[in-house]
Amino acid sequence: MRQDVSLLSTSGSQKNPLGNVKIAPGAVVCVESEIKGDVTIGPRTVVHPKARIYAEAGPIIIGEGNLIEEQAFIRNSFPENIAPDSDVEPKTMIIGTNNVFEVGCYSQAMKMGDNNVIESKAFVGRNVILTSGCIIGACCQVDTCEVIPENTVIYGSDCLRRVQTERPQPQTLQLDFLMKILPNYHHLKKTTKNISTPMKS
């Protein structure tokens, strides 16, 4: 049985030997998640099984207290007109604090502030900048080249927009619950000592 546990705990690194995954103490990252490339995960961030984080075109830095649910896909990919083997400067994807990536969402947004929610099966393209307090509604697709203003809600089959008065509340209680429960049922990726995530500006 011990052998099986050790195999599970190393499976992530075997999938991508060139990867450089740094997990801050206090983060909960399940081994069944798939993380490739240069990825830094901040404290109190929870990554569910089957979530995918691919740093292909440059590093991904994920801040504190983010919730990344099952089958969510965060990807720092190459632009469509650039081949993966071409010599381009790596661009860093930065995700702030207290963001929620719901089941089956797909985010390529290169810059994201704090307290945003990308709901189930929503898509956010790489040229979109999410500021803070935004909600991208379930199944909505946002693939424009724009900065989404703070507290914007995009919703419905026509991706209508409105501005809410308050930003979404951080999922503090849910994170606390998941940080207690997930380790009981899933093996976790090992944390990395002495890593620093960018401080809030």
Curated annotation (Swiss-Prot):
The keyword Lipoprotein is annotated on this UniProt entry: no
UniProt cross-references to InterPro entries, sorted A to Z: DCTN6 (IPR027777), Trimer_LpxA-like_sf (IPR011004)
Signal peptide as annotated in the record: none
Gene Ontology cellular-component annotations: cytoplasm; dynactin complex; kinetochore
Disulphide bond pairs: none
Membrane-spanning segments: none
UniProt subcellular location: Cytoplasm, Cytoskeleton; Chromosome, Centromere, Kinetochore
Keyword Glycoprotein: no
Keyword line: Centromere, Chromosome, Cytoplasm, Cytoskeleton, Kinetochore
Primary location group: cytoplasm
Subunit structure of this chain's protein: Member of the pointed-end complex of the dynactin shoulder complex which contains dctn4, dctn5 and dctn6 subunits and Actr10. Within the complex dctn6 forms a heterodimer with dctn5. Interacts with plk1.
Annotated family: Belongs to the dynactin subunits 5/6 family. Dynactin subunit 6 subfamily.
Protein function: Part of the dynactin complex that activates the molecular motor dynein for ultra-processive transport along microtubules.
The protein's name: Dynactin subunit 6
